[in-house]
Amino acid sequence: MTSNFSQATLQLCYENVNASCIKTPYSPGLRVLLYMVFGFGAVLAVCGNLLVVISVLHFKQLHSPANFLIASLASADFLVGISVMPFSMVRSIESCWYFGDTFCSLHSCCDAAFCYSSLFHLCFISVDRYIAVTEPLVYPTKFTMSVSGICISISWILPLVYSSAVFYTGISATGIENLVSALNCVGGCQVAINQDWVLISFLLFFIPTLVMIILYSKIFLVAKQQAVKIETSISGSKGESSLESHKARVAKRERKAAKTLGVTVMAFMVSWLPYTIDTLIDAFMGFITPAYVYEICGWIAYYNSAMNPLIYAFFYPWFRKAIKLILSGKILKGHSSTTSLFSE
């Protein structure tokens, strides 16, 4: 049986270069299909997250600490879609890197930085939602614009510092010089990382993920208790006070927001867990994972950057309304920034 993944004749990324990497060609039909699938993910990540950023920045009604966190998260996913996914697509399908060693390091650095930035944003968003649900009336005084700004700064600075250390200082290759030398060929962009730094990378994924799981477990427990309390209060007295009515509306709104962002967090964990586990296994068991499994795990993770706008569009009526206004060009009209996006 003829395989799509190999041919009898050996092919090189650069035919006239002795140190060229070996090319593993796909059949023309499969290549077209993969370009369509991967390209669609990149376009969706770019366009979808750009709509989120424009919505939050343009409409004044969306100018809140929590929404600025969401816009910053969308910016990270947008950068994954525009600066990482297109080049990874070519590398995955052509099995060669045609963009040079310098850009290989930059691409790898951006890849790690933007993806960890997404994780850090989600962790801070879970903290925001926890405060909003457990203390809805004092939440505006606790999670202010300045606090949101600090969270956003940390979510960008730490991943950039970590990624720069891994890909530009050479410390991540200590002890695996022979492997680095073996992987060094023209047309390749495979960055080898030693076990210590792989473990650090795993902890950078595991610790924020654990924090999010704990916080969202508490959020849904508190939300359930609030729902029961509000229902009991309403059924016990026909004349509900304005304060109790306000509490009920606030609690309901924050529970819905927590549910939506809980789905976002779950989607991130499901998308990134296979890749993280695969990387950990490879580092400690001698790179036993087949290349195609690694590629599949990597692209499942990449596709997460395209999922968040779809989640917002499904759960948030205000986002659907904002999309209509943006795509119709109505945001170019005067005073469009003051348009009401909420039904209530």
Curated annotation (Swiss-Prot):
GO molecular function: trace-amine receptor activity
UniProt xrefs under PROSITE patterns: G_PROTEIN_RECEP_F1_1 (PS00237), G_PROTEIN_RECEP_F1_2 (PS50262)
Cytoplasmic side: 55-67, 128-146, 218-256, 320-344
Subcellular localization: Cell membrane
Keywords: Cell membrane, Disulfide bond, G-protein coupled receptor, Glycoprotein, Membrane, Receptor, Transducer, Transmembrane, Transmembrane helix
Ranges that cross the membrane: 34-54, 68-88, 103-127, 147-167, 197-217, 257-277, 296-319
Topological domain spans for side Extracellular: 1-33, 89-102, 168-196, 278-295
Top-rank taxon: Eukaryota
Entries under Pfam families matching the protein: 7tm_1
GO biological process, one term: G protein-coupled receptor signaling pathway
Membrane topology: Multi-pass membrane protein
Cellular compartments per GO CC: plasma membrane
UniProt keyword annotation of Acyltransferase present: no
Disulfide pairings: C21-C185, C104-C189
Glycosylation sites: N4, N18
Listed InterPro entries: GPCR_Rhodpsn, GPCR_Rhodpsn_7TM, TAAR, TAAR_fam
Family: Belongs to the G-protein coupled receptor 1 family.
Biological role: Olfactory receptor activated by trace amines. Trace amine compounds are enriched in animal body fluids and act on trace amine-associated receptors (TAARs) to elicit both intraspecific and interspecific innate behaviors. Ligand-binding causes a conformation change that triggers signaling via G(s)-class of G alpha proteins (GNAL or GNAS).
Protein name (Swiss-Prot/TrEMBL): Trace amine-associated receptor 8b
Source lineage: Eukaryota, Metazoa, Chordata, Craniata, Vertebrata
